[in-house]
Amino acid sequence: MSAENASTPNESVEILASVPGTTIPAGAEVKTVLITLPGGNPGTPPHRHPGPAFGYVIKGEVIFELEGEPQRVIKAGETFWEPGGDVIHYQGGNNLPDSESQYIATLLAPPGQPVLTFVSEEELEARKDRRAPRP
């Protein structure tokens, strides 16, 4: 039985995101984290993940920006996906100045590797042509 057909009279199953052809590192470790951002918090500095990351905003609004893509706002009830690897994640901060935002992220990484590494100022400068124009 597929997830699309798994609903019963007492429950409902709704697929929130589907990413075909996702590359998952061999023997991947999977971590699910809850991120809570106070109002106006800019989030984690530019970084990357060694494997894909799937996320769901459960409260508030998150500013989201990946290398090569324009920044966008993801609201409560919406999802995001990152391919991981060499792609820089520039922003994941709270879009609301006075209210808390929260999201859940599931991160995949090869065994023994951190799920997040920061990007140096030198690398950001060298790759600035890959960043989408900002509003």
Question: Where in the sequence are the language-model features?
Answer:
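A short beta-loop-beta micro-motif enriched in histidine and acidic residues
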Residues: 27-28, 40-54
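Conserved hydrophobic/aromatic beta-strand scaffold that supports enzyme active sites
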Residues: 32-34, 54, 79-81, 105
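Ligand-binding loop in jelly-roll beta-barrel domains
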Residues: 70-71, 84-114
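Short acidic-glycine-tyrosine-enriched beta hairpin
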Residues: 25-29, 37-38, 61, 67-86
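Short, conserved beta-strand element in jelly-roll/cupin
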Residues: 36-37, 49-64, 103
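Short histidine-centered beta-strand/loop micro-motifs
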Residues: 44-48, 66, 73, 92-95
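A short, acidic/glycine-rich surface segment
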Residues: 17-19, 41-44, 88-93
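A short, N-terminal "cap"/entry segment at the start of jelly-roll beta-barrel domains
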Residues: 1-31, 73, 81, 117-135
